[in-house]
Regions:
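Alpha-helical scaffold elements lining the catalytic groove of polysaccharide deacetylases
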Residues: 24-47, 63-69, 96-133
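Active-site groove signature of glycoside hydrolases
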Residues: 40-63, 136-138, 142
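C-terminal domain-boundary segment and adjacent tail
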Residues: 77-91, 145-183
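Active-site beta->alpha N-cap acidic-glycine motif
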Residues: 1-26
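Solvent-exposed loop/turn segments at secondary-structure junctions
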Residues: 16-20, 60-64, 90-92, 112-115, ...
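Hydrophobic faces of well-ordered beta-strands that scaffold small-molecule active sites
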Residues: 10-14, 53-57, 84-87, 106-109, ...
Length: 183
């Protein structure tokens, strides 16, 4: 059974052109593509997996720095009525700011949890995320479906501090919008 069928919100992980793979034909969003083609690629991604509540970028260090590409992506996301989560694969990404300019709800990744697929590293990244959440009232942290990560995540609820609440990205964005957590 798919996440959407269980009522679990899910997002599309859209391949975008990376600096180290410039010209990669597998990227749905590439610098230099006509805006209409970018919009069609994003629209087709939604048609292929209906029910997605948002999008984040897979790779995309090149594409997320390009204004024309990001404007086309955000125009389509606005039409779909979904959010954008900037994976922050580039410190120079403009995706988040373009999303906000286009009235697309948006958030930014703040912690990569599993740059190394090893439990000790993943836990240290969670501790970093917990500290940011306590300081800022919330944090976005992302990970991959890697063996070490998938082994670690089920144990997280048992070992996480009691003052930490895990929420979905839509819940995070709602908190950001209204400025407080709904109990």
């Amino acid at each position: 059974m798919m996440a959407g069928e269980k009522g679990i919100p899910f997002i599309l992980h859209i391949p975008m052109e990376a600096k180290r793979y410039v010209g990669d034909k597998n990227a749905l969003v590439r610098v230099g593509m006509p805006p209409d083609l970018i919009r069609m690629s994003v629209r087709n991604a939604f048609w292929s997996l209906p029910g997605a509540v948002g999008v984040n970028n897979h790779q995309g260090s090149h594409a997320t720095e390009d204004l024309r590409a990001m404007e086309a992506v955000m125009k389509e996301l606005a039409a779909e009525g979904v959010f954008f989560l900037d994976s922050r694969t580039s410190g120079s990404s403009i995706a988040y700011s373009v999303a906000l300019e286009k009235d697309v709800p948006a958030a930014r990744n703040q912690v990569f949890l599993d740059h190394y697929d090893e439990g000790g590293f993943i836990w240290s990244q969670f501790e970093k995320a917990f500290a940011i959440a306590r300081r800022n009232g919330g944090v976005i942290a992302i990970c991959h479906a890697r063996p070490g990560t998938l082994d670690f995540l089920p144990r997280l609820y048992e070992i996480a501090p009691e003052d930490i609440k895990f929420v979905t990205v839509p819940e995070y964005l709602e908190h950001k919008r209204i400025g407080s957590w709904e109990e």
